[in-house]
Curated annotation (Swiss-Prot):
<dbReference type="GO" id="GO:0005737">
    <property type="term" value="C:cytoplasm"/>
</dbReference>
<dbReference type="GO" id="GO:0008914">
    <property type="term" value="F:leucyl-tRNA--protein transferase activity"/>
</dbReference>
<dbReference type="Pfam" id="PF04376">
    <property type="entry name" value="ATE_N"/>
</dbReference>
<comment type="similarity">
    <text>Belongs to the R-transferase family. Bpt subfamily.</text>
</comment>
<keyword id="KW-0808">Transferase</keyword>
<dbReference type="InterPro" id="IPR017138">
    <property type="entry name" value="Asp_Glu_LeuTrfase"/>
</dbReference>
<dbReference type="InterPro" id="IPR007472">
    <property type="entry name" value="N-end_Aminoacyl_Trfase_C"/>
</dbReference>
<keyword id="KW-0012">Acyltransferase</keyword>
<dbReference type="Pfam" id="PF04377">
    <property type="entry name" value="ATE_C"/>
</dbReference>
<dbReference type="GO" id="GO:0004057">
    <property type="term" value="F:arginyl-tRNA--protein transferase activity"/>
</dbReference>
<dbReference type="InterPro" id="IPR016181">
    <property type="entry name" value="Acyl_CoA_acyltransferase"/>
</dbReference>
<dbReference type="InterPro" id="IPR030700">
    <property type="entry name" value="N-end_Aminoacyl_Trfase"/>
</dbReference>
<dbReference type="GO" id="GO:0071596">
    <property type="term" value="P:ubiquitin-dependent protein catabolic process via the N-end rule pathway"/>
</dbReference>
<dbReference type="InterPro" id="IPR007471">
    <property type="entry name" value="N-end_Aminoacyl_Trfase_N"/>
</dbReference>
<keyword id="KW-0963">Cytoplasm</keyword>
<protein>
    <recommendedName>
        <fullName>Aspartate/glutamate leucyltransferase</fullName>
        <ecNumber>2.3.2.29</ecNumber>
    </recommendedName>
</protein>
<comment type="function">
    <text>Functions in the N-end rule pathway of protein degradation where it conjugates Leu from its aminoacyl-tRNA to the N-termini of proteins containing an N-terminal aspartate or glutamate.</text>
</comment>
């Protein structure tokens, strides 16, 4: 990864923003989506990206964007207040059921073992979604390319079996949960456990927020995010806490 330290003092105003052409929405069938993209990408270091995330942006590989759809505002950026978070009964059960897992924090790196788990996860949990056919190159572009402070966290069983991987960006004011994939045959709400683990990491690092990307009220795939409270939503240019 290139050294971006010399760009730390560049002002946020050096970036430009453009809107993409419409494309099929990945979350709401029959809808067209557009994105607002921040460019040039080589100026987006961790400090700049932290500011962008605070304004509702997200990244996919080196592509930094936020929804910019015509006549639709369904995608809402959300973040969890880590210090005030209180798990519900289901979340406490998920936390207890995976206490035997061991987490190993590492730099981003290609691994056939990781790619195999990613493929099994996509085929088991999201068949026919397109990502279940991702090549090695597509996987690497999606999860292993970054210009910000990113970590790969491996979760293994006591026997050494790889159970889950979480890709996490370390921001100035929190952690951003980029993507998590896990063994589809392993029971016990691994996805929930990953978020709980990341909240604990925020507390350990004294970072106030865990950014969870976008929540969509009409998307079943996104519904779980509303279960982590206190939750703030970025609406009309400001973060607002959702009612309990």
């Amino acid at each position: 990864m290139p050294d971006m330290s010399q760009l730390k003092e560049l002002p946020f105003s050096t970036l430009q923003f453009y809107a993409t052409a419409p494309y099929p929405c990945s979350y709401l069938p029959g809808r067209q989506a557009r994105s607002q993209v921040a460019a040039p990408g080589h100026l987006i270091n961790t400090g700049t990206y932290s500011q962008l995330v605070e304004q509702g942006f997200r990244r996919s590989g080196l592509f930094t964007y936020r929804p910019h759809c015509d006549n639709c505002h369904a995608c809402v950026p959300v973040r969890v207040d880590a210090a005030r978070f209180e798990p519900n009964r289901t979340q406490r059960r998920a936390w207890r059921s995976h206490q035997a897992l061991r987490a190993f924090v590492a730099e981003l790196a290609w691994s056939p073992e990781h790619y195999d788990l990613y493929t099994r996860y996509q085929q088991g949990r999201h068949p026919g979604g397109g990502m279940d056919e991702d090549s090695r190159t597509q996987y690497a572009q999606f999860l292993l390319t970054t210009r910000v402070n990113t970590r790969l966290v491996k979760f293994r069983t006591p026997q050494g079996q790889l159970a889950m991987i979480s890709i996490i960006d370390v921001l100035d004011d929190g952690l951003s949960s980029v993507y998590t994939f896990y063994d589809p045959d392993m029971a016990g709400s691994l996805g929930t456990y990953s978020i709980l683990w990341q909240i604990e990491q925020c507390r350990t690092l004294d970072l106030p927020w865990l950014y969870l990307g976008y929540w969509i009220a009409d998307s079943r795939k996104m519904a779980y995010k509303a279960n982590f409270r206190p939750l703030q939503m970025h609406v009309d240019g400001a973060w607002r806490e959702t009612p309990p």
